[in-house]
Amino acid sequence: MNQTAQLSSTQTYDNPIPGREFILSLFSSLKKHLNREQIADALSLNSPEEKEALRRRLRAMERDGQLSFQRRGYQLIDPESLVSGTISIHPDGFGFVTYSDTEKDLFLPKNQLKHVFDGDLVQVLIEPDKNAKRAYNNLIKVLERNTTQIVGVLQREGKSYFLLPDDTKVSQHIEVDESKLCDARVGQYVTAKITSYPNFRQDTQVEIIEVLGDPSDAGIESKLALHRHGISGLWNKILLEKASTHGTQVAEADKASRVDYRKLPFVTIDGADARDFDDAVYCEQTEAGDWRLLVAIADVSHYVLPNDALDIEAQQRATSIYLPDQVVPMLPESLSNGLCSLNPNEDRLAMVCKMSINAKGLVTQSEFSEGLIQSHARLTYNQANALVSKPSSKLGKAVLESNPAIAPHVKNLHSLFKVLLKQRNQRGAIEFETRELALKLNKHKNIANISPVKRNDAHRMIEEFMLCANVATAQFLETNKIPSLFRVHAGPQQKKLTALRAFLSEKGLTLGGGDKPSSHHYNDLLKKVSHRTDAKVIQTLLLRSQSQAEYSPKNQGHFGLAYDAYAHFTSPIRRYPDLLTHRAIRAKIRSTKKPMSLQGVLRHLKLNTLASKAMSKNAYPYSVDDVEVLSKHCSEQSRLADTVSREVESALMCKYMQPFIGETFQAAIAGMNSSGFFVALENTGAEGLVHITSLPGEDFSFDASKQKIANKKVCYEIGDSVTVLLKSVDLRGRKMHFTVAVSTH
């Protein structure tokens, strides 16, 4: 032992033991796992005092990342082989660690994740094997916990209480002390706070902080999903009061310096159940045959100022969440459904995008203004469609009688839509045919019936107008070099493209464009296969080859829509990026472009970090770095909203299908992997797995390149029609399992 190590030991402990360097050299020489007793024997430490000092030293070395403790004992860590990343845990127990934008995620087996929760920041040791053919990944430690609360069902076994997590990604045994039950009854859903995280020496310890209800309670599915992801559907009383201070009508002072568009017959066209109206449209044709389109969007930015309390909360939420039985709004209802909603026959503040569109459907000029509008009518999609497509129908006549003045303007909108539709086709926007289902709930918030959503020209008309405004917005942001958020959609990744081309080759088909196909190439193939019996299969795989759209501070274009630049402008009531865009436009209009720091707001995104006063309406307080942080946050929140919505729909569907266990259904194969194939029932759209081991016959195998599951006699492909029997419903996992009853093969 060297003198430095000896001196360190003497200073640290009353009972000197070998220093860290000596212990590290011991591991280097033995090159294996050692438990504490083996280390003590190797160092000739025999007294209880020496062994206690060794225990402390080993724990300190573990804490400082020099040693790792596993069930086999301690092991030496090579710092150069350590990486840190976020763990994503699969419901089956294994997980993947994302640690690099360029490197593949690291696989960790189930037996290493007994003390880890989904989303934890972990440290992993990458160790090549003796043959250096592949690396083994060993979890070293959890650096930062992501989970602080767990939702589950309170259970009892003998005299002990425990929590059965609602999230199947949580596999740990979770103990609940009898003194920490918070009046919860066995069988009830609860939210529990983690008081002690698991390790090799103890299980997870929690205390119940809220009783959510019984499994039979109306709306329990939404309540569980929101709590599972830490989302509050409630509003702070102070924020509600702040939102209500703006009143219910636009103040006269706020109308000053606005462009007055109230005489123009703007109209809102939305779904029958819509409660917030954030867009209104008007168009007219010029004598030259061109068009003038005005898209007016609710001016949320006038009422929600950068860095004020409402803004901080809206920023946290980043989006409204739409569930089958409720909406979790980004803004308080006094704003979202009240003062900011473009209700008919009421003065409303709006950001207006005015566009000139030529006879070819190209936007030749656009400008933005702070406007004052009044919607002249609130129409549903079906009402608007009846006016232009079926004016002599009962609905068409009823709309015409109730508001005859609006009819010619709606017909103008439809005429412009047809021009824009031709341009859309020429531009090459990808047209996938997708099936959307609407869940109608009863008073108990269970599914009463399921019906397909029927889109008509009115849906597509409003969509095209919003696209025009969003593109004009993106061009405005790019031209003026304003740090803001673009909505980007990259082309297909090479890995997905290679797999797609292999599949198409098996079908005797090719996708043009080489390594960088365009949306035109996708559309050409879709048209080519439209009359084939396997058209649905091919469309499904073309769709799955696409990347996911996201927010970015850099314009990268939108592949699917075939736009060079695209941003979100049209929904500031329900999307924070749109609110940010409105602030950018206002800042340019008012010539206040100086970037300011957001201080700790973006770092913490919590109300209790609010330390400074709200900024003026003129301010645009976002630097490039701020926008970078916001782009990631808004993308994550958008994906989270989709996840929560899917989970609630899956839970409701499982509950709806449970009484039909043992019955047969006609279905189509929607996807497949090595576990089996997924089916979607034709009548309800309910989805579930047919496991490969349950297929009638023997020796079935999955061919990833051909997207087939087959044996010598039978072959299953995506799009095939099969008759399936509902075998079981897993309410906790929100999954259904089927078996093949009668195959059409």
What are these regions, as identified by a protein language model?
Residues 41, 181, 191, 197, ...:
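Electropositive polyanion-binding surfaces
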Residues 1-294, 301-347, 378, 385, ...:
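Charge-lined substrate channels and their catalytic hotspots, especially those that engage the 3′ end
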